[in-house]
């Protein structure tokens, strides 16, 4: 079978444009998308008929007959071809003789014979013609469109001649394609020629595999034998849509269904219908077997075909309107007692006489192209159709012309710094629609940019969604759960748990003696090494002390007391078991003391108060107890539960008593146990970049045992433990619970306070670190992004004074503390502080290059520039500031910000004068003769002219000033002068107020 034609190919054959052909197809009910779409052969044939194409064009889509091998004889029921399917012709057979024409062939086109009436042949029937019925009747032609009268079906006398007889009596037929001679010498009817087949009703579907192309052949009226008509116009094959040839299958099925005798009727004779394709002698010289009656169909098999091949399908034959039953107007459905007139829709159905006619049925593939045929009926709607109709009934959620989905109160969980693309994936919407909707709400963002939490929640409320931004803790927990990891829980049962030393954090105000206390306990001197005598980092030590003749191990954390190290104190409180609050007896409760109390209470950590410096004469321990009572720390001697110990760190007084109190609190209030056999988990309390060792993290192991060679992940850094050292610089191979160690081997400097976790291999550690890093960047981008509305766009584009800084420090905690302290500086909106980069380690050339490009200042805290960074900074003019004490860096940055502020000016009145007379001069105009009443009048000063208490001129200038005939710079009170003003509209008795704008220094 040749390939299917496309729309543009058929249009080229027909000599029209593709657009015209598409329009015609649409009018005919064939819905084809584009000019490149393929068309089924029946539709091609219809279009060719519609546009009057030549026969050569039609031959492209017709099924070509091909020779087939002779098949074994089969029963007639199985030999009948399927309706609508092209049948291959048999091998060359005997040319059939034409059958005798009946009266029906001479009837008008569209006329249908009455049921039960068989036309009498004009001459003796040739072999192969249909047999004469038992009760012949005169032919009567019905008008086109009239319904035939019901009558009982007449049974034929016999089924027809045998194939052998038909072969003997057959006459030579004309060549294929030529017109066959009319039997009996009957002349051709002289009526009007058969009309050319025109356009038919739209097909049900463009499907070549449907039964009969979506149509059902009409039954023959009366069930009698088919009239032996002459050759059809053009001598073509059987027209499409004619009655099904009789046979066992048709007779049996239709006879049983309708209760009629011979629904299928006799099969057309061998000679009827013109010559066979590739006309040759039929094998064994037989004609086609005739269709039997209902009894024969049900009781005995029909005669077998001897030809072995199938005849052409009705779907392959052109229509013959002259022999087609007329269509009755009206709707389809089952016919009545009147023989079931022609069916509606696309079928030409009709029942047999005396029975209920079968109406038109739907096409084989209903709904493929256009509405199905037959009578319209209400079917069940699909779920999708119902859902679409329901959603269309709902009020659309439209924001600024953009249709968005309605959340109906659903909850959406998004990570920090999520983008609109992430939001769109969650709700199944288009990211571009969300961008446009947010633009209409006054926010300008892209689909992939990180969006702040407030913006996500605002957009969610507009779409009726509840947006929950996942907290950092939940986000990290979900990340670890995706790798089947957990942090913060001991593995195993209680039998696997063992006691661990307490972790004690020393907290308090600056210069109250925290580091001196630890020095006394460790019998070392650490405070002398600190810059400025203050602690600027967390120190972790593990010492062994004798408490009540028992050696106990205690881990101490020394936190800074300066106000800039709030985050460090909070981190120390979270990593500890017991907090020792150091308060100087001669100083009292200070702001950082109160802050330390709040941190300890927030972490639910028991507090032991150490009242220090009791050796000083002005010390008042009782005063300290009274002050701390206001903050909920009630001494035991006052009936409370807080232990107070009076000590002197400098002289070493009562240190043992303090350690005993710490151990007593740990034993009484805390159950300090951990599993030492599990994979290690801990916290990085400090981290820095060492010149020779690389990134170094100070870690406290909270549970498990950390060993050299373990794969670890700390925050957004990962690596393998290459070396561990204790607080004395000695190498250790493993570290158990509550043990502080310095870990080397990470790929970067972790953040202070990041959790440390041992994982199975480096691959998992790298994946966790990379995902944490990506989330951290998104959150930072969302937080640092400024919300710019359309109304504020003009003001944002104006130039602002911005101080760009690059922070470098010796460890992560110092950089964090410095950044937080700088961001807390309160300044006006006209000056902004922007920290563009931060890092741990020396100042590098990369930092200098970035500073030069962004006009930034580098703040180096406890680090210096390395290599050629200093030379490059001098060449580029980059300002690098070095500091060793954090509060000095804060003070200088604050002063620099204040210096960038625009000056504040204040108006100051310097004198008043009154116009007494006005003179005119051609060269200068009006001259005001004035008397200075108070103050001074200066040349080029700014004046305000007042008339009758109303200001008539503002910001006028004294252009010229004279005293007598001499020019004067200023004139004092009590003197007359003449002046020329820049404002010409002056009059006598006007008051002149002279003032100047003076810069006022800003308050510190």
UniProtKB/Swiss-Prot annotation:
Compositionally biased tracts (Pro residues): 184-196, 219-236
Pfam family for this entry, one: IF-2
Q: Where is the composition biased (Low complexity)?
A: 62-157, 173-183, 279-303
> Could you tell me which residues belong to the region G3?
558-561
Q: Where is this region: Disordered?
A: 36-393
Bias (Basic residues): 377-386
Molecular function GO labels: GTP binding; GTPase activity; translation initiation factor activity
Task: Show the segment(s) annotated as G1.
Answer: 508-515
Q: What is this protein called?
A: Translation initiation factor IF-2
What organism, scientifically named, is this protein from? Corynebacterium glutamicum (strain ATCC 13032 / DSM 20300 / JCM 1318 / BCRC 11384 / CCUG 27702 / LMG 3730 / NBRC 12168 / NCIMB 10025 / NRRL B-2784 / 534)
High-level lineage: Bacteria, Bacillati, Actinomycetota, Actinomycetes, Mycobacteriales
């Amino acid at each position: 079978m040749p390939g299917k034609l496309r729309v543009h190919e058929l249009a080229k054959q027909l000599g029209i444009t593709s657009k015209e052909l598409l329009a015609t197809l649409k009018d005919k009910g064939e819905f084809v998308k584009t000019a490149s779409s393929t068309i089924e052969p029946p539709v091609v044939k219809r279009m060719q008929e519609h546009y009057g194409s030549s026969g050569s064009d039609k031959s492209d889509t017709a099924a070509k007959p091909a020779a087939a091998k002779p098949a074994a004889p089969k029963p007639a029921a199985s030999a009948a071809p399927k309706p609508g399917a092209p049948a291959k012709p048999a091998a060359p057979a005997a040319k059939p003789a034409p059958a005798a024409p009946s009266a029906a062939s001479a009837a008008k086109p569209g006329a249908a014979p009455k049921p039960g009436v068989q036309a009498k042949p004009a001459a003796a029937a040739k072999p192969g013609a249909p047999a004469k019925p038992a009760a012949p009747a005169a032919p009567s032609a019905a008008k086109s469109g009239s319904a035939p009268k019901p009558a009982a079906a007449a049974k034929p006398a016999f089924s027809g001649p045998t194939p052998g007889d038909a072969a003997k009596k057959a006459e030579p037929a004309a060549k294929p394609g030529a017109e066959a001679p009319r039997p009996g010498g009957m002349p051709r009817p002289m009526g009007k020629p058969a009309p050319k087949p025109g356009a038919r009703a739209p097909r049900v579907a463009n499907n070549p595999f449907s039964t009969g192309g979506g149509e059902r052949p009409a039954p023959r009226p009366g069930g009698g034998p088919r009239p032996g008509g002459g050759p059809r116009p053009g001598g073509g094959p059987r027209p499409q849509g004619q009655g099904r040839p009789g046979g066992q299958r048709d007779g049996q099925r239709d006879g049983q269904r309708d209760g009629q005798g011979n629904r299928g009727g006799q099969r057309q004779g061998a000679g009827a219908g013109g010559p066979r394709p590739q006309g040759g002698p039929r094998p064994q010289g037989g004609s086609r077997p005739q269709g039997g009656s209902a009894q024969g169909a049900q009781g005995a098999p029909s005669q077998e075909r001897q030809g072995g091949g199938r005849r052409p399908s009705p779907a392959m034959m052109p229509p013959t309107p002259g022999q087609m039953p007329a269509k009755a107007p009206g709707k389809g459905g089952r016919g009545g007692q009147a023989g079931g007139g022609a069916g509606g829709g696309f079928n030409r159905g009709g029942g047999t006489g005396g029975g209920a006619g079968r109406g038109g049925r739907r096409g084989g593939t209903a709904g493929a192209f256009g509405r199905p045929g037959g009578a319209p009926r209400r079917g069940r709607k699909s779920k999708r159709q119902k859902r679409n109709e329901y959603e269309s009934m709902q009020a659309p959620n439209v924001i600024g012309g953009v249709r968005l989905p309605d959340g109906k109160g659903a909850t959406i969980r998004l990570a920090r710094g999520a983008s609109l693309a992430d939001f769109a994936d969650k709700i199944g919407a288009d990211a571009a629609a969300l961008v446009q909707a947010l633009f209409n709400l006054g926010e300008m963002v892209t689909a992939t940019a990180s969006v702040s939490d407030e913006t996500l929640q605002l957009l969610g409320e507009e779409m009726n969604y509840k947006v929950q931004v996942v907290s950092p803790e939940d986000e990290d927990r979900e990340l670890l759960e995706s790798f089947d990891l957990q942090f913060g829980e001991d593995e195993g049962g209680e039998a696997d748990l063992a006691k661990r030393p307490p972790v004690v954090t020393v907290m308090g105000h600056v210069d109250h003696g925290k580091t001196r206390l630890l020095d006394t306990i460790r019998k070392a001197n650490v405070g002398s090494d600190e810059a400025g005598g203050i602690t600027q980092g967390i120190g972790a030590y593990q010492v062994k002390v004798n408490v009540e003749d028992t050696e106990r191990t205690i881990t101490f954390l020394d936190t800074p007391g300066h106000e800039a190290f709030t985050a460090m104190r909070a981190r120390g409180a979270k990593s500890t078991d017991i907090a020792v609050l150091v308060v100087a007896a001669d100083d009292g409760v200070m702001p950082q003391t109160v802050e330390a109390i709040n941190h300890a209470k927030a972490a639910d950590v028991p507090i032991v108060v150490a009242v220090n410096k009791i050796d000083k004469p002005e010390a008042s321990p009782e005063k300290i107890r009274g002050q701390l009572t206001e903050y909920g720390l009630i001494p035991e001697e006052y009936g409370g539960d807080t232990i107070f110990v009076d000590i002197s760190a400098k002289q070493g007084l009562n240190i043992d008593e303090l350690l005993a109190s710490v151990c007593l609190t740990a034993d009484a209030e805390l159950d300090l146990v951990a599993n030492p056999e599990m994979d290690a988990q801990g916290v990085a309390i400090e981290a820095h970049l060492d010149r020779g060792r690389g990134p170094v993290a100070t870690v406290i192991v909270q549970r498990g045992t950390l060993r050299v060679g373990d794969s670890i992940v700390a925050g957004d850094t990962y690596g393998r433990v290459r070396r561990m050292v204790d607080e004395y610089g000695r190498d250790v191979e493993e570290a158990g619970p509550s043990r502080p160690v310095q870990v080397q081997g990470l790929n970067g400097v972790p953040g202070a306070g990041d959790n440390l976790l041992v994982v199975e291999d480096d691959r998992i550690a790298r994946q966790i670190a990379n995902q944490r890093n990506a989330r951290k960047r998104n959150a930072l981008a969302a937080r640092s992004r400024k919300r710019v509305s359309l109304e504020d766009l003009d003001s944002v584009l104006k130039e602002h004074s911005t101080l760009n800084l690059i922070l470098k420090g010796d460890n992560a905690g110092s950089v964090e503390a410095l950044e937080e302290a700088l961001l807390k500086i309160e300044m006006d909106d006209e000056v902004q502080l922007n920290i563009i980069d931060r890092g741990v380690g020396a100042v590098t050339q990369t930092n200098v290059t970035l500073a030069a490009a962004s006009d930034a200042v580098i703040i180096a805290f406890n680090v210096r520039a390395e290599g050629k960074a200093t030379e490059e900074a001098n060449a580029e003019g980059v300002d690098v500031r070095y500091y060793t004490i954090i509060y000095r860096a804060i003070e200088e940055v604050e002063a620099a910000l204040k210096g960038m502020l625009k000056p504040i000016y204040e108006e100051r009145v310097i004198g008043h004068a009154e116009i007494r007379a006005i003179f005119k001069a051609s060269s200068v105009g009006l001259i005001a003769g004035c008397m200075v009443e108070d103050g001074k009048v200066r040349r080029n000063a700014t004046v305000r002219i007042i008339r009758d208490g109303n200001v008539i001129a503002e910001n006028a200038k004294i252009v010229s000033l004279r005293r007598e005939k001499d020019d004067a710079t200023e004139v004092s009170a009590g003197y007359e002068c003449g002046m020329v003003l820049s404002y010409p509209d002056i009059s006598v008795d006007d008051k002149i107020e002279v003032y100047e704008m003076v810069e006022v220094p800003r308050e510190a």
